[in-house]
Amino acid sequence: MAFTNEQMERYSRHIILQEVGVKGQKKLLNGKVLIIGAGGLGAPAAMYLAAAGVGTIGIVDADEVDLSNLQRQIIHGTADVGKAKVKSAKETMNAMNPDVTVNTYREFVTSENIMDLIKDYDFIIDGTDNFPAKFLINDACVMAKKPFSHAGIIRFKGQLMTYVPGEGPCYRCVFKNPPPKDAVPTCKQAGVIGAMGGVIGSLQAMEAIKYLLGVGDLLTGKLLTFDALKMEFHTVKLPKADHKCAICGDHPTITQLIDYEQIECPDH
């Protein structure tokens, strides 16, 4: 595949990098990333992946754009209020970079559809805002041997980790089981500073880009936390994969996917 003059100019700041070059940019254009949730995390992740020239990007979200989303979900604008989030996101991404194919899935992830959703993608980004969805995404990715980036944001704090099959603990190794319903507030209940999604969602995009390129160190076996009020990042080394883990352990007890409760809040 030969690049056009326009592509050489568009991706020139990538191509000049020793870690990327023409070969790496071709890897990005051939890459496929699925983003679950077109909200506070998914919005910046989608925009940076599209700008980077990741060739195929899937967006999963059943919701419509609400006015309260616009404080942080920068892929949508005022004129998009009432529009399906996946449609709004696709329009923004296509306007930014016509090289990118954007696949839209206007649905919630469930135990019945998630394996079909993730099967054709190289890397998954979890941009959801509830524990049932996060555990479902983890379990499906472990079963399908798909790498993924987990992240969460609330108030002035954020965190993320990356799972790559065979290279460290999964989300369930670390957090075991979903907390009781309503035990942990959502962003809607507790609030979130808008720029937090930009910080953490952009880091999720960075993890996906590094994975596709095969460069640098991923957040496998590590949890990165950010406190915006203190302006402090910390990287915590996680325990090794739990050989007793219910999904990725030596003798898994979870052999089929389940929905812990109705997943009604798909993104931040």
Task: Label each region the model flagged.
Residues M1-H268:
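Adenine nucleotide-associated cytosolic modules
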